[in-house]
């Protein structure tokens, strides 16, 4: 619980058999998590059994892709505050406290992995990933007149229940570039949001998305294409985010 609000953590898994059990246990150990929901997205053999050894609830999403799994998690989670994270050991469960602190004033809290002092030795944050994520984030800032953003690829984030429902209803991207879509849906909904630094650790195992520079570059290009298309269909009146629950464009 965070105050009087229930906290759900959603973990989407595909290739995290070696780490998922310890990550689930780590989130419960924080003392603020009421539910850990694991979305099994056609995960490697043995993953489901690892999850069953924990108190986590597991659901199965057959449509392959980060976007499909995230949407399922947002729909299935029962909490008032919903935290998305990776079960690969790259994020510290303890950092959930940072996100929760800002949930008292914000509808969305996005993590950023671009603070050098919090990037651990061996973490997969080479210069092209760090600066690439930064550049795409600045593109969103410029096109959507937003608050400060520095990392579109960070998947450690928090949404309120109302905002999670709105995002799940409007999501269209099923693949690995769904992260910026969720961010853009939050921005254009009028949600109040903030970005905060989180720790970034070496991954346990190999990533199917960013383990290869070529794949990471391809995902980045898909993100840029998505952002440009999203901007083209967004009315100018929606480029000054307002408080969630008010008419877009009214401001605070």
Predicted regions and their residues:
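Acidic donor-binding/catalytic loop of UDP-sugar-dependent glycosyltransferases
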Residues: 46, 85-102
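Donor nucleotide-sugar binding loop of glycosyltransferases
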Residues: 16-19, 43, 66
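Acceptor/aglycone-binding surface of glycosyltransferases and processive sugar-polymer synthases
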Residues: 62-64, 68-76, 94-172, 203-213, ...
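Short, well-formed alpha-helical segments that are part of the catalytic scaffolds
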Residues: 14-29
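Short aromatic/hydrophobic "clamp" motif used to bind/position activated sugar donors
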Residues: 82
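A conserved acidic beta->alpha catalytic loop
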Residues: 40-48
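Cell-envelope/extracellular polymer assembly enzymes that use nucleotide-activated donors
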Residues: 6-8, 35, 181
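Hydrophobic helical membrane-anchoring modules
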Residues: 1-4, 18, 146, 170-252
